[in-house]
Amino acid sequence: MDKLRITGGAQLRGEVTISGAKNSALPILCAGLLTADPLVLANVPDLNDTSTMLRLLGRMGVRAERGADGIVTVQASQVDNLEAPYDLVKTMRASILVLGPLLARFGQARVSLPGGCTIGQRPVDQHIKGMAALGADIRIEHGFVVAQAARLKGASIRTDMVTVTGTENLLMAAVLAEGQTVLENAAREPEIVDLAELLIKMGARIQGHGTDRIVIDGVASLHGAEHSVIPDRIEAGTFLCAVGAAGGDITLRNAAPDTLGATLDKLIEAGLTIETGPDWIRGAMQGRPRAVGARTHEYPGFATDMQAQLMALDTVAQGTAVIVENIFENRYMHVQELRRMGADIDIDGHTAVVRGVPRLSGAAVMATDLRASASLVIAGLAAEGQTQVDRIYHLDRGYDRMEVKLRALGANIQRLTGKEPA
C-alpha cells in the first residue's frame, strides 16, 4: 500500500488550487440517474470516491466519462441494473445516494448497506423513514436496502436529526414525486445548496435550500444540464491548518471563503493572518499558533470534518485547547497516532484536551479515516525529523493529489508506492 514520507520543518509558501468539493460531487453524480439526458459537470475532483461512484453508475448502465479537460459527463439513458452491489458500496458510504434517484425515476432500488470511514454508526434509518413517508415500500433484507414504489407521493418529512446525506437523498427523491414535499430539520450545508442548484437547472422546483426547511414541488421529468461543482471547503480548511501548524504564507485559488466562516474564525483566533477575495483565501502564520478550542456542529457551525485538522494545529500551539465532538462518536482515532509523535492529548468521552508542545517528533503513524489522515500529514509537516503515514488510501478518498500540492508549496513530502497486500 502507498505511504507518505514527510520531512518536517519546511514552511509552506506559494499558491495552490482547491479542487471541487467531494461532498458535492458525489450527490451531483447520482443526480444523473434522474434524467435520460446528459449532465455535463465541471470541477469534479479526481478522487478515489468519485472514481468509485463513476464505477457504480457504470455498473448500472450509466455512461460515465471523464474527459482530458476534467469535464465529467454522465448519461443515464440506458440504465439496466437497479442494484448497488456490496463490492462497490462497501468502500464508500455516499453510495446510499443512488437510492432516492433510482426510486424516483425507476420505481425500485436495491442498495447494499454502505461502508466508508469507520466513524461511528452513521445509520441510514432516516433515509428509510423519509422514503417510506414518500410512499415507498422499503425494508432491509440480507444486507440490502430494498425499495419500490409506483410513483412517490409528496409528504411533509421531519428527520429525527440533521442528516446531510439524508437531506440529499430525500431531495433527489422528491423532485420527481407527485405533489409537494416539505423537508423539515433539513441540513443547510453548501453542498446541499449546490445539489439543489443543479436540480433546478434540470427543471426541478425547489425553494428554501440553505435553510432548515426545503419545499419541493414535484415535476414529471427532468432534463440535462451543465454545472460546475463548488470548491471543497474542507480541502481549503485543511491547507490553512497546515500553514498554521508549519508556518508560512499561502494563497488558495478556486476557493469559496463564504462557505468557511466558522473555520476562518477559528484560524484567526489561532493567530493566522487571513485575507479573502471572491474566489481566493490567503493564510499566513509566523511563530507558533495560539491554542483554540472548538465544538463541532452542523453547518454553519464548525465542521466535524475539520476537527482532526484543527487538533493537529493545536498539538504545536501555545496553550491548551478543548475540542468537543458533537456529531459522530468514535472520531478521535487519530489521537493515539498524534501521541506517537509527542502530542499531549487527553480524551474523556466526546471531549479532547490538547496541551500544545513546542515541537512534535516524526514517527511512523497509521491513518484510520479520511480526515484523520489529513491531521497526520499536518502533524508531519510541523514535526522534527521524518514522519511516515501509512494507509493513505484513506487520504486519497477525499484529497486530490495532496502531496503534489503540498510539494508545490515547499513541503518535503513524497509518496512511496507499493503493491496492495494479497
Swiss-Prot record:
Main subcellular location: cytoplasm
Superkingdom classification of source: Bacteria
Pathway: Cell wall biogenesis; peptidoglycan biosynthesis
Binding-site positions, phosphoenolpyruvate: 22-23
Catalysis performed (reactions): phosphoenolpyruvate + UDP-N-acetyl-alpha-D-glucosamine = UDP-N-acetyl-3-O-(1-carboxyvinyl)-alpha-D-glucosamine + phosphate
Molecular functions (GO terms): UDP-N-acetylglucosamine 1-carboxyvinyltransferase activity
Sequence positions that bind UDP-N-acetyl-alpha-D-glucosamine: 93, 122-126, 305, 327
Active site residues according to the UniProt entry: 117 (proton donor)
E.C. numbers: 2.5.1.7
Modified residues (2-(S-cysteinyl)pyruvic acid O-phosphothioketal): 117
Enzyme class: transferase
GO cellular component: cytoplasm
Database matches in InterPro entries: Enolpyruvate_Tfrase_dom, Enolpyruvate_Tfrase_sf, MurA_subfamily, RNA3'P_cycl/enolpyr_Trfase_a/b, UDP_GlcNAc_COvinyl_MurA
Keyword tags: Cell cycle, Cell division, Cell shape, Cell wall biogenesis/degradation, Cytoplasm, Peptidoglycan synthesis, Pyruvate, Transferase
Subcellular location(s) of the protein: Cytoplasm
GO biological process, one term: regulation of cell shape
NCBIfam families tied to this protein: murA (TIGR01072), PRK09369.1 (NF006873)
Similarity remark: Belongs to the EPSP synthase family. MurA subfamily.
Protein function: Cell wall formation. Adds enolpyruvyl to UDP-N-acetylglucosamine.
Official protein name in the record: UDP-N-acetylglucosamine 1-carboxyvinyltransferase
Gene: murA
